[in-house]
Amino acid sequence: MKIERVNDNTVKFFITYTDIERRGFARDEIWYNRERGEQLFWQMMDEANEKESISFEGPLWIQVQAFEKGLEVTVTIAKTTIDGEQVDEDELDSLLRSAMSDAEEKETELSQDVLFETTDFEHIIALSQYAEAPIFEEVKTSLYQKDGLYLLHLHFKEETEVEEQENVMSLIAEYLNFSEQTIHPVAEYGKVIVPNDVFAFIRKHFPN
């Protein structure tokens, strides 16, 4: 799970479905079993408190966005409610169900082309040091720059198993954010930084 502290009051999480399952939660039960869904949510909060020393006390405003690979959860700690809205247990349950509906529509199959993004090149350098595992042999990589973002493009072989693809994306999601952009406009209007074998190139030119 990736934890990003946006400011003093806001924290953003990204957790892949693979990570959710590794934590002992079945993908379906977190949506349809209220108690299990809340257990996962507060487990994420506890991890943020442990790693970032964030105390989640007081009213919380929560936004859940579903992607085909996982969930992005934005939590804002407020002294007062935001836009008159405050999330209680029933609303948390409703948010999770809504996110699941969106995810089911997107999750028919994993795309062969996936984009990750970051504004900090150091994150790509750090990731590259851990991207020598055999699972990365199944993916082609290229790196672009566009609108102030570094965009890492992954292209998986057609025969790549879904579990292997999710394992790769789960590791990368610890360092970079999933991008909602698609490769075609990025390739057309962005600047190519590294055309292929991104991780090997970065390790060679930016040794740890």
Curated annotation (Swiss-Prot):
Superkingdom of the source species = Bacteria
Gene name tied to this protein: mecA
Task: Name the chain's protein.
Answer: Adapter protein MecA
Free-text function comment from the UniProt entry: Enables the recognition and targeting of unfolded and aggregated proteins to the ClpC protease or to other proteins involved in proteolysis.
Pfam families in the record: MecA (PF05389)
Quaternary context:
Homodimer.
Q: Which GO terms describe its molecular function?
A: protein-macromolecule adaptor activity
Q: What is known of its domains?
A: The N-terminal domain probably binds unfolded/aggregated proteins; the C-terminal domain interacts with ClpC.
InterPro entries referenced in this protein's UniProt entry, alphabetically: MecA_C_sf (IPR038471), Neg-reg_MecA (IPR008681)
Protein family (similarity comment): Belongs to the MecA family.
